[in-house]
Amino acid sequence: MTYEKPDLKRTKATVSFKRIYLHRASEFPGPWLCQCSSIMAQYHAWRGDLPRYLHVLHEKYGDFVRYAPNHVSIRHCDVWEDVYGFQRNVSKYDTTYSPFRLAPDFTSTWNTSNVDVHKSRRKLLNKLFSEQHLDDYGTLITVQVDEFMRQILEALPKDKDVMAGPINFAYKSDVVAREIITSLVSGQTYGFQSGDAKSASLLADISKFERKLYLLGFAPWLKMLPSFKPTLALAQWIVQSSKQGLASGSKNTLVAKMLAARDEEKDVEFSRNDVIADARFFLLGGSVTSSSALSATLFFLLHHPVEMQELYDELRGIFPTYEDIKADAQLMRCKRLRAVFEESMRLAPPVPTLLPRLVGPGGIKACGRYVPEGVVIGAPCWAISRDKRYFDKPNVFKPDRWLADSSDPVALEKMLLATRASQPFSYGPRACPGRALAFRENGLLLAKLVYAFEMEPVQDKSIVEESLTGICDGLVFNQLDTVGAHEVELMVRYRLRLDGKTKRRVSGN
């Protein structure tokens, strides 16, 4: 018996023809290579610039773009309600979310694909981030923020007119965010802010592992590589933090509140495995989005001194002294503080790429078009947030767009449209429940920084220099897309404000 040698060229041509013309997603436009293969999506995921790549594709092909054979990106403000809203015929795309599970049946509220399980557990989780509980976390947050500010103050030169630094605020914000989430989960700190070799090494391991988990969603075969396993130090940190939270006598940690949570209708509890799974997600994903939002906001303020001054004026008008700035309800009333965060997260979302959803049996109608069963779809947050249909001068940093009220109906209508389009914490039943907590944490940090210091940017790698289709004005913050967004760096010089009063308030003298 003889065997014919397989004709690889013919096989490739046949597969390509079927994917381009006969595939269930073939009606959606996109580059021919993207229609044939996932290699471009994998490449840009590896580069960390997939959100910007999707923006370029949408500028060329329109609102619907096929960026991989079975993946369609939808750039339209209605996609949030049509795809991510309640009772939609979609589920989380398991290939993307399964790498984040400790075991196949060991799921967190965030990465479970089971709609009923998510609904039950999310109802409990929402209680952890209600206004009733936010004040309970204030002390843990304040302790770490004060330590952060103490270190910044100690680095000042004796000559108060000389700028300190430069220091990498992107790294510093990541450090304090990791410390805060560790203390919120376990009631204890790890010592990230100490800056010792052990904590610095673990921080590097965490960042690398988050990136690896993200890449596994695009290329699952990578999990066979030994380098894609967590390091021993990382595994110990996750396990120990979870166990400490379970053993802690404090009632104000996330773990303690998860254990105490009850579903009023069904009397459902978080099991120990549920707690560990959610604690793991908080530890890995709960800090990167916070640090990203803080870094982005500081970046845009540094490059827009007028807006920086307006924020400072608001803070001085609300808080007579530095010590009056606390993680409480009064901080939530700082309208301009909220506006600069909203605008920064629009231009540099903490989760800039799309969160994929698998279309269920019977298909779905999204943004006026039918999408067949089995197609993976999602909203490209970065691209939608720079769409001129929803924002005046979409690439320009304009916090005032979020401060409209009923006295200006036109501006108010534009703000409502912008609110529909910009969803940095996602939308619907799967939206991030910790938005209010993130604002308290970041709001406290930013308010104290702006209140205490004059700051200026240093020429660094924080600005994207490449030319992007449709973007000819404004600045693009250099983010590396992973589980959330990691910033390349943000180098800053700073000094105490020159009124001479702040120094006593910050140092406590």
From Swiss-Prot:
Keywords: Heme, Iron, Metal-binding, Monooxygenase, Oxidoreductase, Virulence. Its EC number is 1.-.-.-. It comes from the Eukaryota. The keyword Signal does not apply. The keyword Heme applies. SUPFAM superfamilies: Cytochrome P450. Its cofactor is heme. Gene3D superfamilies: Cytochrome P450. It holds the Pfam family p450. GO terms for molecular function: heme binding; iron ion binding; monooxygenase activity; oxidoreductase activity, acting on paired donors, with incorporation or reduction of molecular oxygen. Heme binds at C432. GO terms for biological process: biosynthetic process. Pathway: Mycotoxin biosynthesis. CDD domains: CYP67-like. It is an enzyme of class 1 (oxidoreductase). PANTHER family: CYTOCHROME P450, CYTOCHROME P450 MONOOXYGENASE ASQL-RELATED. Cytochrome P450 monooxygenase; part of the gene clusters that mediate the biosynthesis of the host-selective toxins (HSTs) AF-toxins responsible for Alternaria black spot of strawberry disease by the strawberry pathotype. AF-toxin I and III are valine derivatives of 2,3-dyhydroxy-isovaleric acid and 2-hydroxy-isovaleric acid respectively, while AF II is an isoleucine derivative of 2-hydroxy-valeric acid. These derivatives are bound to a 9,10-epoxy-8-hydroxy-9-methyl-decatrienoic acid (EDA) moiety. Belongs to the cytochrome P450 family. Gene clusters encoding host-selective toxins (HSTs) are localized on conditionally dispensable chromosomes (CDCs), also called supernumerary chromosomes, where they are present in multiple copies. The CDCs are not essential for saprophytic growth but controls host-selective pathogenicity. This is Cytochrome P450 monooxygenase AFT11-1.
